[in-house]
UniProtKB/Swiss-Prot annotation:
HAMAP family: CH60 (MF_00600)
Residues annotated as signal peptide: none
Family classification: Belongs to the chaperonin (HSP60) family.
Keyword Translocase: no
Binding residues annotated for ATP, in chain numbering: 30-33, 51, 87-91, 415, 495
Role, per record: Together with its co-chaperonin GroES, plays an essential role in assisting protein folding. The GroEL-GroES system forms a nano-cage that allows encapsulation of the non-native substrate proteins and provides a physical environment optimized to promote and accelerate protein folding.
InterPro entries associated with the record: Chaperonin_Cpn60_CS, Cpn60/GroEL, Cpn60/GroEL/TCP-1, GroEL-like_apical_dom_sf, GROEL-like_equatorial_sf, TCP-1-like_intermed_sf
PROSITE patterns (UniProt xref): CHAPERONINS_CPN60 (PS00296)
Gene name of the encoded protein: groEL
Name used for this protein in its record: Chaperonin GroEL
Molecular functions (GO terms): ATP binding; ATP-dependent protein folding chaperone; isomerase activity; unfolded protein binding
One Pfam match: Cpn60_TCP1
Length: 545
């Protein structure tokens, strides 16, 4: 085991604070509408330019082991805030730095670190309750666009495209962000349920100009097995021929004689039919077939529940307004399933998402829920260069997380105002002693830090701005974008409650632990092995006789 270096007391805290400051100072220049960019060197490819706090934090690794520990702990604050709410990473870092700086001053002055931490925790718990009281619902499109705009560093086009996407696919819908080909941002919306399986034979195509199959008001047959014998399908096909309606078959596979017969019947115009493979594999396929059944009002024909294909009737089939099948995808539009059953299925999937521990499973369940609830929107980010593309895509993703958080827990006035208002209401939290009271004061001072940093980044005097805002009331705050004061909600400067709450809780949690640190242990740097000295030159040989 390698030898370790141990640092105690104030020496340890000073080193830790130095690391905290290096990381936080690099991150906090990005805060607010007039925040600056940070350029990150990459070992390959072009440098990355970003205004995303967590991206900056993740890049920082310090040479001094003890300073690095401080930096890594603040990095943890940013990462946790990012995981919980998807935004607010810079705010969390600024709060953590403020609490640690003030806290360590108090410890150096002889106060009890544990009591300071308890005071900070009490203040934060009270602040979270006040934030919830201050919060307002974020229901309309305008508010969603404003939240998106603020999170995307005042880029209105991003806020608007996210609001449009949410309007089209609903609050539960899936919105994904991709790199686009154009210079401008684009929005693609797939309405209805789409899954990544195309037609089993090109002979089903009835729209040669688009190379797709379109079925109007079709029946939908769902089978959880391979179909290779046409005899199994005859009763359904005969019943269908009488109605004159088209049929979509979704099965594990349709092959051999069954597929050939379907193709021939389709080409002769006897029955208009198309077949696709069921989406997913194993248990996920069963679940997705059941989703389609609920969406279309049909029944999955599966032998494990005692249903046989030969005995199926038109009653077992689902129906939809329209189905479009391309080489790679099948889209079912306006299934005729019962709304109550669809809603029950959505809430069942929601429950599974909450219980799931795997990110992959969560993502797949989220997709299934979106397909049932309304559809999928894809935001294609446009930019002139790859460097700009990366920076813009990160901002769009941040804005998307922020709007989701706003829909979930509501919004509070932005620009650091919410924390200032909350601080004024919790000054008289009950505490057990003077040191705890000072812990509360540390937390209250820290709650001003984001507002002060926004003002500093805008080139204003932080103390003047902070006092002006503190003397106001309600939503009155400072708009750094155009250097004016006024009602933050009316000016459209909103922060999601969840983002502000998460930033405060994670910052206080980790900063509290740092204040109570008394010793730090790190490996000693390995001394380099000495070089082998150069071998002396061999003497010249004497003259030989």
């Amino acid at each position: 085991m390698a030898a370790k270096e141990v640092v105690f007391g104030n020496d340890a805290r000073v080193k830790m604070l130095a690391g905290v400051n290096i990381l936080a100072n690099a991150v906090k220049v990005t805060l607010g509408p007039k925040g600056r960019n940070v350029v990150l060197d990459k070992s390959f490819g072009s440098p990355l330019i970003t205004k995303d706090g967590v991206s900056v934090a993740k890049e920082i690794e310090l040479e001094d082991k003890f300073e690095n520990m401080g930096a890594q702990m603040v990095k943890e604050v940013a990462s946790k805030a990012n995981d919980a709410a998807g935004d607010g990473t810079t705010t969390a870092t600024v709060l953590a730095q403020a609490i640690v700086t003030e806290g360590l001053k108090a410890v150096a002055a002889g106060m009890n670190p544990m009591d300071l931490k308890r005071g900070i925790d009490k203040a934060v718990a009270a602040a979270v309750i006040e934030l919830k009281n201050l919060s307002q619902d974020c229901a309309d499109s305008k508010a969603i666009a404003q939240v998106g705009t603020i999170s995307a560093n005042s880029d209105e086009s991003i806020g608007e495209i996210i609001a449009t996407a949410m309007e089209k696919v609903g609050k539960e819908g899936v919105i994904t962000v991709e790199e686009g080909q154009a210079l401008e941002n684009e929005l693609d919306v797939v309405e209805g349920m789409q899954f990544d399986r195309g037609y089993l034979s090109p002979y089903f195509i009835n729209k040669p100009e688009t190379g797709s199959v379109e079925l109007d008001h079709p029946f939908v047959l769902l089978v959880d097995k391979k179909i290779s014998n046409i005899r199994e399908l005859l009763p359904i096909l005969e019943g269908l021929a009488k109605t004159g309606k088209p049929l979509l078959i979704v099965a594990e596979d349709v092959e051999g004689e069954a597929l050939a017969t379907l193709v021939v019947n389709n080409m002769r115009g006897i029955v208009k039919v198309a077949a696709v493979k069921a989406p997913g594999f194993g248990d996920r396929r069963k679940a997705m077939l059941q989703d389609v059944a609920i969406l279309t009002g049909g029944t999955v024909i599966a032998e494990e529940i005692g249903l046989e294909l030969e005995k199926a009737t038109l009653e077992d089939l689902g129906t939809a307004k329209r189905v479009v099948i391309t080489k790679d995808n099948t889209t079912i539009i306006d299934g005729n399933g019962e709304q109550a059953q669809i809603e029950a299925r959505v809430s069942q999937i929601k429950q599974q998402i909450e219980e799931s521990t795997s990110d992959y499973d969560k993502e797949k369940l989220q997709e299934r829920m979106a397909k049932l609830a309304g559809g999928v929107a894809v935001i294609k980010v446009g930019a002139a260069t790859e460097v700009e593309m990366k920076e813009k895509k990160a901002r769009v993703e941040d804005a998307l997380h922020a709007t989701r958080a706003a829909v979930e827990e509501g919004v509070v006035p932005g620009g650091g105002v919410a924390l200032v208002r909350v601080a004024s209401k919790i000054a008289d939290v009950e505490v057990a002693n003077e040191d705890q009271k000072h812990g509360v004061v540390i937390a209250l001072r820290a709650m001003e830090a984001p507002l002060r940093q926004i003002a500093t980044n805008a080139g204003e005097e932080a103390s003047v701005v902070a006092n002006t805002v503190k003397n106001g009331s309600g939503n009155y705050g400072y708009n750094a974008g155009n250097d004016t004061y006024g009602d933050m909600l009316e000016m459209g400067i909103l922060d999601p409650t969840k983002v502000t709450r998460s930033a405060l809780q994670f910052a206080a949690s980790i900063a509290g632990l740092m204040i109570t640190t008394e010793a730090m242990v790190a490996e000693l740097p390995k001394a380099d092995a000495p070089d082998m000295g150069g071998m002396g030159g061999m003497g010249g040989m004497g003259g030989m006789m």
